[in-house]
Amino acid sequence: MAKQYDVLFRLLLIGDSGVGKTCLLCRFTDNEFHSSHISTIGVDFKMKTIEVDGIKVRIQIWDTAGQERYQTITKQYYRRAQGIFLVYDISSERSYQHIMKWVSDVDEYAPEGVQKILIGNKADEEQKRQVGREQGQQLAREYGMDFYETSACTNLNIKESFTRLTELVLQAHRKELEGLRTRANHELALAELEEDEGKPEGPANSSKTCWC
């Protein structure tokens, strides 16, 4: 039976409550958009497999609550992330200003070398815009991040941003990938995904390894 994936790793979506993190997740994984969502309580996640440069990548994408009362819970997930989206709402200057706080949390709790992308979401709401595209680009440059404006509503830059963060994580693990490319059946000797943290889409495959 063909392998379902070659590597597995974890991405996080962080940012203020209401910036559209859950909508981004649902659009990418299920190609669905709902204009209203119940605020995430603690954390939730979905899975998706994509192929990048011939590597089948299984991505575990965690959607974290933005409310302050859940911060102690959500920060526990930073330390095992390989990639993080920092999300603000272009129609909310407040959410943009809070990116500095989210970056500080990443610096404190996430592993060194974690890959990051800045997202200005709800780009379809141009008439409500409070944060210019140039502001997002400038902030991303200050923190050394790639930047995308996205819209889960219109599907703008959803695939592109998730694919790019996946590429960045793979590039950061190029040594492991060199072994993977030269020995197609070799499985990376890395920590196994903890099955008790959620319910993947299908039965767990005990032979798979991950970068979590």
Curated annotation (Swiss-Prot):
Signal peptide region: none
Annotated compartments: Cell membrane
Keyword RNA-binding: no
InterPro entries tied to this protein: P-loop_NTPase, Rab15, Small_GTP-bd, Small_GTPase, Small_GTPase_Rab
Residues spanned by motif Switch 2: 63-80
CDD domains on file: Rab15
Substrates-to-products reaction catalysed: GTP + H2O = GDP + phosphate + H(+)
EC number assigned by the record: 3.6.5.2
A single MF term (Gene Ontology): GTPase activity
Modified positions (Cysteine methyl ester) in chain numbering: C212
Coiled-coil residue windows: none
Residues given in the record as Mg(2+) binding sites: T22, T40, D63
Region of interest called Disordered, as start-end residue ranges on this chain: 192-212
Membrane topology, from the record: Lipid-anchor
Role: The small GTPases Rab are key regulators of intracellular membrane trafficking, from the formation of transport vesicles to their fusion with membranes. Rabs cycle between an inactive GDP-bound form and an active GTP-bound form that is able to recruit to membranes different sets of downstream effectors directly responsible for vesicle formation, movement, tethering and fusion. RAB15 may act in concert with RAB3A in regulating aspects of synaptic vesicle membrane flow within the nerve terminal.
NCBIfam families assigned: small_GTP
Record comment regarding domains: Switch 1, switch 2 and the interswitch regions are characteristic of Rab GTPases and mediate the interactions with Rab downstream effectors. The switch regions undergo conformational changes upon nucleotide binding which drives interaction with specific sets of effector proteins, with most effectors only binding to GTP-bound Rab.
Family: Belongs to the small GTPase superfamily. Rab family.
Complexes and interactors: The GTP bound form of RAB15 interacts with REP15. Interacts (GTP-bound form) with MICAL1, MICAL3, MICALCL, EHBP1 and EHBP1L1.
Name of the protein: Ras-related protein Rab-15
Record organism: Bos taurus (Bovine)
